[in-house]
């Protein structure tokens, strides 16, 4: 292909149609023969120059020789232009910077959410990029950050922007997904088989429309989850596995309208105090999310309608029960689902993407301590004191097993009760300051005030009284 391009660029390479002998050729320097625009630079076209030859017989090359030199120059130009969307070396350096941020700010949950919300707008029914949404870096624009589902993500962008400024050779789309996967791994989760090379959108007009991300409290939670995730091309197993990432993080009523302002697990941090978490150790990635939803023993732990649906819906429940019992199975399925989610809608350059997994595996970062020398004698045995059995915690909501005596079941053993969701935390008791101001403004717009109730509508009261009297008269008359 490069030779054909060179031939089209150099008309001298085509044979002359004239049958008569050509006139004597003027001597052309090598610089003139090889000087043409190549790879784009800030200073204009890059020109390949060499010093004029001291030997005329070598400087005056044949037409085929000049064509070959031009073709080789085009090949060199094309090879230099074939650069991936992101630089692999800069991505690796950015990953180290992300790890340092995670250690100091405990921002694992919001980094996971950043990557998810950039890719979760994908619509498999739309082929064109970027109209189809997905992992394209559009979340950096205010037009998309202002979507209701993205409340609070401006804080994640503030943390990640200095890294983007430091490494301009990587795209936002890659950086968001790199931060998300790194946060999972640093929190103790599985290694995500990621690939990179995502291309960024360039304008706010390319942002997807609002309403493609899942809602926490839909009217029919299971149907809503399927509607949103099926649109992305994900199945029931992937829905449940990805939901398990709620083992990290908290819900804040001033952002989502859900959860308590604080609990015994969040009032002292780490990070910014407050909010309600799904799990006790909400910065540790494990399968506690599924265990805690199933047991429902602690009212300080959050259960959204979409969380409860995982144990209420028959198809979801198969996977939720499995993950509650088998953390290894959860890690495996989650890693695959996360990698798939991070690729949704992305346009890769190169088309196949590239991996950063050419360095030691994660397990090798923290090597196990060396075993004690064989010659060292074992310590004397210590008599263990038998601890008292822990007092069982009563199940107050959503008990998995009925507590009624066998006599109430005609002598049969107690039967499991259907899963009952915990009391949903609608967050209506604690409104954010902005919401309070909005409600107050609307209230005052109708003529009311905090110190003065709305005046009665006397005309409406009279009409209601007349209507009531007319109704009574009709009854008495009949």
UniProtKB/Swiss-Prot annotation:
Where in the cell does this protein reside? Plastid, Chloroplast thylakoid membrane
Query: Where are the annotated segments for Disordered?
Result: 1-31, 44-66, 245-276, 346-417
Q: Which InterPro entries match?
A: Ccp1-like, Haem_peroxidase, Haem_peroxidase_sf, Peroxidase_I, Peroxidases_heam-ligand_BS
Q: What class of enzyme is it?
A: oxidoreductase
Q: Where is this site: Transition state stabilizer?
A: 113
Chain sites annotated for binding K(+): 247, 279, 286
Per the UniProt record, which EC number(s) apply here?
1.11.1.11
A molecular function (GO) term: heme binding
Reported induction:
Induced by salt stress, abscisic acid (ABA), sodium nitrate and hydrogen peroxide in roots. Induced by infection with the bacterial pathogen Xanthomonas oryzae pv. oryzae (Xoo). Down-regulated by salt stress in leaves. Down-regulated by hydrogen peroxide in leaves.
Which SUPFAM superfamilies does the entry link to? Heme-dependent peroxidases
- Indicate the secretion signal residues: none
Family annotation (PROSITE patterns): PEROXIDASE_1 (PS00435), PEROXIDASE_4 (PS50873)
Which Gene3D superfamilies does this chain map to?
1.10.520.10, Peroxidase, domain 2 (1.10.420.10)
Which Pfam family, any one of them, does this sequence belong to? peroxidase
Query: Which regions span the lipid bilayer?
Result: 458-478
Write out the biased-composition intervals (Low complexity): 1-13, 394-406
Q: Where is the active site?
A: 117
Q: Could you list this entry's UniProt keywords, alphabetically sorted.
A: Calcium, Chloroplast, Heme, Hydrogen peroxide, Iron, Membrane, Metal-binding, Oxidoreductase, Peroxidase, Plant defense, Plastid, Potassium, Stress response, Thylakoid, Transit peptide, Transmembrane, Transmembrane helix
Gene Ontology cellular-component terms for this entry are: chloroplast thylakoid membrane
- Give the transit peptide range: 1-76
- Further information: Binds one cation per subunit; probably K(+), but might also be Ca(2+). Plants over-expressing APX8 exhibit increased tolerance to the bacterial pathogen Xanthomonas oryzae pv. oryzae (Xoo). Plants silencing APX8 show increased sensitivity to Xoo.
Protein name (record)? Probable L-ascorbate peroxidase 8, chloroplastic
Species annotation: Oryza sativa subsp. japonica (Rice)
UniProt lists the gene as APX8
């Amino acid at each position: 292909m490069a030779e054909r391009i060179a031939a089209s660029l150099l008309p001298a390479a085509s044979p002359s149609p004239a049958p008569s002998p050509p006139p004597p050729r003027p001597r052309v320097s090598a610089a003139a023969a090889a000087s043409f625009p190549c790879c784009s630079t800030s200073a204009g076209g890059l020109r390949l120059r060499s010093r004029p030859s001291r030997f005329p017989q070598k400087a005056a090359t044949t037409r085929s020789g000049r064509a070959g030199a031009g073709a080789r120059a085009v090949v060199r130009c094309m090879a230099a232009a074939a650069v991936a969307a992101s630089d692999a070396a800069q991505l690796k350096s950015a990953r180290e910077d992300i790890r340092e941020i995670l250690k100091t700010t405990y921002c694992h949950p919001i980094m996971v959410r950043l990557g998810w919300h950039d890719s979760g707008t994908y619509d498999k029914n739309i082929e064109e990029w970027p109209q189809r949404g997905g992992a394209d870096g559009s979340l950096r624009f205010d037009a998309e950050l202002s979507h209701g589902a993205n409340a609070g993500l401006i804080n994640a962008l503030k943390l990640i922007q200095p890294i983007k400024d430091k490494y301009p050779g990587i795209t936002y789309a890659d950086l968001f997904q790199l931060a998300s996967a790194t946060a999972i791994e640093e929190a103790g989760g599985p290694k995500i088989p990621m690939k990179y090379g995502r291309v960024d959108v360039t304008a706010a007009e390319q942002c997807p429309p609002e309403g493609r991300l899942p809602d926490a409290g839909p009217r029919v939670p299971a149907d809503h989850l399927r509607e949103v995730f099926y649109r992305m091309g994900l199945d029931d197993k992937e829905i449940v596995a990805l939901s398990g990432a709620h083992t990290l993080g908290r819900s804040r009523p001033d952002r989502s309208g859900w959860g308590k302002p604080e609990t015994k697990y969040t009032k002292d941090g780490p990070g910014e105090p407050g909010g309600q978490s799904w799990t006790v150790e909400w910065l540790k990635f494990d399968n506690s999310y599924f265990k805690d939803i199933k047991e429902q023993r602690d009212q300080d732990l959050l259960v959204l309608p979409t969380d409860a649906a995982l144990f209420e819906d028959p198809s979801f429940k198969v996977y939720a029960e499995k993950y509650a019992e088998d953390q290894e199975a959860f890690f495996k399925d989650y890693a695959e689902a996360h990698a798939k989610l991070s690729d949704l809608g992305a346009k890769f350059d190169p088309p196949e993407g590239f991996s950063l997994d050419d360095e030691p595996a994660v397990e090798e970062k923290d090597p196990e301590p060396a075993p004690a020398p064989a010659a060292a004698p074992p310590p004397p045995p210590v008599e263990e004191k038998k601890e008292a059995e822990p007092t069982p915690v009563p199940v107050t909501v959503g008990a998995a097993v009925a507590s009624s005596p066998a006599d109430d079941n005609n002598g049969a053993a107690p039967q499991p009760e259907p899963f009952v969701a915990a009391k949903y935390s609608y967050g209506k008791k604690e409104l954010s300051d902005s919401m309070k101001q909005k409600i107050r403004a609307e209230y005052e717009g109708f003529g009311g005030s905090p110190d003065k109730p709305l005046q009665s509508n006397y005309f409406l009261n009279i009409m209601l009284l007349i209507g009531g009297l007319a109704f009574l008269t009709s009854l008495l008359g009949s």
